[in-house]
Amino acid sequence: MTVRTPGTPASKIDKTPATTPNGHRGREEKIVVTVRLRPLNKRELSAKDHAAWECIDDHTIIYRPVPQERAAQPASSFTFDKVFGPDSITEAVYEEGVKNVALSSLMGINATIFAYGQTSSGKTYTMRGITEKAVNDIYAHIMSTPEREFRIRISGLEIYNENVRDLLNSESGRSLKLLDDPEKGTVVEKLVEETASNDQHLRHLISICEAQRQVGETALNDTSSRSHQIIRLTIESTLRESSDCVRSYVASLNFVDLAGSERASQTNADGARLREGCHINLSLMTLTTVIRKLSVGKRSGHIPYRDSKLTRILQHSLGGNARTAIICTLSPASSHVEQSRNTLYFATRAKEVTNNAQVNMVVSDKQLVKHLQKEVARLEAELRTPDPANEKDWKIQQMEMEIEELKRQRDLAQSQVDELRRKLQEEQGPKPSESVSPVVKKCLSFSGTLSPNLEEKAPVRSERTRNTMGRQSMRQSLAAPFTLMHEIRKLEHLQEQLGDEANRALEVLQKEVACHRLGNQDAAETIAKLQAEIREMRSIRPLPKEVEVGSVVAVNKSVSANLKEEIARLHSQGSTIADLEEQLENVQKSLDKLVMSLPSNNDQQSNNDTTQKAKHPSKKKKLLPLTSSNSINRQNFLKSPCSPLSTARQVLDCEVENRAPDSDDLSCEIQPDETPTKSDGGDVSSKEGTPYRRSSSVNMRKMQKMFQEAAEENVRNIRSYVTELKERVAKLQYQKQLLVCQVLELEANEAAGYNLEDDENIHQIPEESPVSWQITFKEQRQQIIDLWDVCYVSIIHRSQFYLLFKGDPADEIYLEVELRRLTWLQQHLAELGNATPARVGNEPTVSLSSSIRALKREREFLAKRLTTRLTAEERDYLYIKWEVPLEGKQRRMQFINKLWTNPHDAKHVHESAEIVAKLVGFCEGGNMSREMFELNFVLPSDRRPWFAGWNQISDLLHI
């Protein structure tokens, strides 16, 4: 009789593990079952035993009895996921049978690999090879995944005579307790867990576990395993620090080498070996019972996991949260046919067991806190700066709703007007007094009609009163649409006037900016004049030898006197420049006030005005924003365009004019005593009064939105121009100080002395040739580089200066200024030593320790930029080039600390500057210019303006 069982579908084996965050959902898949048939061993060959089992293909194994036994035992076949014959190697068993299951532990899915079979069938031999191959693949995957950080922990235990023993700690005792954990399941108390540092360390720990296992000799096997061995690898992987992901994968990989089932009649066991065999068979019988009940598919019945410590420890691997692979090993000998057949029956049932594998993710407390802090910061930023698109959409929806409401009310009013007109035309006749009564009856909102008796008893005066009130209500209903149209035209006129006033306000600001612009031209002309005189002084030709010494001295004194006069003028203009800066600040504040005064809360203002009107109906507005009486005041505000006070007044006036117009002047046409009472005509008057109030609010919002867009554009243009003026003022201040330094140098040279009696000392300053300038440039730049290193100057500043000034003759002035600044800084640091100077106001203190700390923070900043500005390949290339170990820790800081460390190596300096420039990005887009860079090279002194350019690098580090 041939028995064929279906194999597990390949789609359920080869499918990549699905990512299921937090482990809430998994996917069902069946246990992968493979069968390995070993060749006949020496004992079986010596006993002239023959092979009774044969693998006919990769999925089927068949029983072939000897001819004399075919009648009693017919041939039978079994089909599994994979079948390996006697010639197969362990590597093939691993690659084609259990590799996918083993490597799924790297993705956060628990995995278990069993070796099941009778004694002497090759279980331990197979599991050793499987474990070795799995370790190789695990570490190969770790090396190919540098973006994740892996940590592997190993523990080993054996179950010997139903006692749990720790294989990594022989002193732990013979029996460890099993505890139930609500999250981890069944755990072994006091089980040692070692962390593997590398693959060699892991193999060493596995070999220790194998050496500590109980092994004995039987009639079937010289080295028979007398206990169940479980080696568990706990693999945890986390993304590196550069990622924002806070979840980690945690999974366990179990290598289970079961002891073989045996018959006492075949093993000839007695005493201790017999007792060991009994415990082995009992635990394997419990495992078979669990597999049989799980294969039925009905989970409602009791599954005896707790009947054996083996099934209790491996409960998750049997129908739980894990992927499981079972390797059943067989002996082909005909003397073991019954044991082999029982093994195949066990494998057939195991094929039908379904597991529910899930991805196990955990979040560490430290990573969770960092993630939550970032999330809180992001949410706070969103609250501080709401999405303009959403706010704009909300406003559009509000306006659309108001427009629809106004349209509905307009249609209602129009229908009422048409109805009134039609009734009036129908009732027109020879007696006008008779035509009033029907209209009044239609217009007045009575809850019912008067009875005939009450009509007869009503006096004539009440009849006349009702007729009069009816005519008034009719006139108000007719006048409401025309009033609405009149108010719309009035609002359009107000919109035009408000636009004109806004244009006038912006013209005033532009005139004020132009006034400041003309004010600093005198200082610029004076500085240009001084520069021309200095160039003229340097270009004086050599005087003839017969020129008298007195004339030369007179010329030098006259030049010095002229320069001193110009310096005095510049100092006198210092207050002018300060006033100019103050005026520019006032203009900036005026612009900010103008932006803040733009209408943004119109709805609230309109509601406040309406509420105030309702509380005080008889109170009139004394100051209307756009009436002719205020035109004279507005002209007075525009008289002084250059005064900051006038600018502030103009901004305040614009703020008053941008308010919503009071609705008291709109409602004055309808007298309070003419309005019908609520009982008579209140419904009609309330319906007629709502549309034009809402229409005025909508038109005012439209008008203010148009004005706001135009005003914001003009304010942005003026603000950019004011910023440019501030930069020019700072540049003029710097040039003035530079000229002062040059004059002081000339006086020092004159005092230090020219020996005017010797003709050789009266000579012209020779014009430097390109060759001599290049030599001077290299010497000065090398001095600057040395001083940079001594004074712990910012390496970003070094790189920017080094790459910007490359030997052009126009660079002479910048090198001179930098050399002076560094010389002063060196002297200043030498005088201070390790002391820290006292802080004066808000000015930064410069000391040796503060410079070192600033340089350290700057290097940390550049190390962080490595991951964002460079690719992984570029970083590895630089690590190799700068001799930074690729496997070392803190590679980025090691690399950054090597930059700008050798000032005497020109190649090192150039490469360091290029790397820093690439990390900071100031060379991108050509944004380096001498005009802006000169503000960073000002000499320090006790005056505040000298520190104008010292904060550039610190500002960059706080981006």
Swiss-Prot record:
Residues of the signal peptide: none
First-listed, main subcellular location of the protein, grouped into a coarse class: cytoplasm
Keywords (A to Z) from UniProt: ATP-binding, Cell cycle, Cell division, Coiled coil, Cytoplasm, Cytoskeleton, Microtubule, Motor protein, Nucleotide-binding, Nucleus, Phosphoprotein
PTM annotation, UniProt: Phosphorylated at Thr-145, Thr-675 and Thr-690 by CDKAs and CDKBs. The phosphorylation occurs before metaphase and inhibits the interaction with NPK1 preventing the transition to cytokinesis.
Compartment(s) where it occurs, according to its Swiss-Prot or TrEMBL record: Cytoplasm; Nucleus; Cytoplasm, Cytoskeleton, Phragmoplast
SUPFAM superfamilies to which the protein is assigned, alphabetical: P-loop containing nucleoside triphosphate hydrolases
Subunit structure: Interacts (via C-terminus) with NPK1 (via C-terminus).
Protein name, per record: Kinesin-like protein NACK1
Gene name, Swiss-Prot/TrEMBL: NACK1
